[in-house]
Amino acid sequence: MHGDPQQLELLRVARIGRAQGLKGEVTVRLYTDDPEWRFEPDSVLYSQDGETEYIVEGSRTFKDRWILKLEGVDDRNAAEALNGVELYGEADDAEDMLEADEWYPKDLIGLEARLVEGNGLGLPAGQVVGKVVDVVDSPAQSLLKIRLTEPVVTGQNSKGEDVVEKTALVPFVEALVPDIDLEEQYLTLDPPGGLIPGL
């Protein structure tokens, strides 16, 4: 047993998609940056309420997708019945994650977004761009939604009214978001020109 599910702190790991083949395998959309560990054989995943356990029997990748085989799901019909189910895993200890320089998407919300030293825009290091207000899932990668410190007029609409951009979406990849400091509550950005309005 893994303890009272109501006492577990659960984090969304994946959403089950379509069945793969005839033997009960399912494709999954990832919400974790550590699928190798989450999907090890005998790993336990949970429904959102923690009441239902899903035990990983095996996992593999195929064309950049992860495919899971869960215990008790042995044919295509059973696999198709799980389409849309979201899988949750136990959250790691926060202190251990800080030491390992790891974080969950929810940890990024509220962080100040600053320009990295030596950024490609040639602007001062530490210049505050805004604050992270959301982490948006997209098919390619997660996006950081940043509320800009200063709204930017980017043009005019057909009525001659100013178009004001108050937020920017930045792909959450290391090249654009090189540093994250949860203790100091900021992250750094190295955006190309045109990605963030006004820069």
Curated annotation (Swiss-Prot):
Q: Does the keyword Magnesium apply?
A: no
Q: List the disulfide bonds.
A: none
Q: Which residues form the PRC barrel domain?
A: 100-195
Q: Which domain of life does the UniProt lineage start with? A: Bacteria
GO MF terms on file?
Answer: ribosome binding
Annotated GO CC locations: cytoplasm; ribosome
Question: Biological process GO annotation list?
Answer: ribosomal small subunit biogenesis; rRNA processing
Xref: InterPro entries: PRC_barrel-like_sf, PRC_RimM, RimM, RimM_N, RimM_N_sf, Transl_B-barrel_sf
Compartments annotated for it: namely: Cytoplasm
What are the alphabetically sorted keywords of the record? Chaperone, Cytoplasm, Ribosome biogenesis, rRNA processing
Q: What is known of its domains?
A: The PRC barrel domain binds ribosomal protein uS19.
| Matches recorded under PANTHER family | RIBOSOME MATURATION FACTOR RIMM
Q: What does this protein do?
A: An accessory protein needed during the final step in the assembly of 30S ribosomal subunit, possibly for assembly of the head region. Essential for efficient processing of 16S rRNA. May be needed both before and after RbfA during the maturation of 16S rRNA. It has affinity for free ribosomal 30S subunits but not for 70S ribosomes.
Please describe the quaternary structure of this protein.
Binds ribosomal protein uS19.
Question: Belongs to which family?
Answer: Belongs to the RimM family.
Q: What is this protein called?
A: Ribosome maturation factor RimM
Q: Which organism is it from?
A: Bifidobacterium longum (strain DJO10A)
Q: Which gene encodes it?
A: rimM
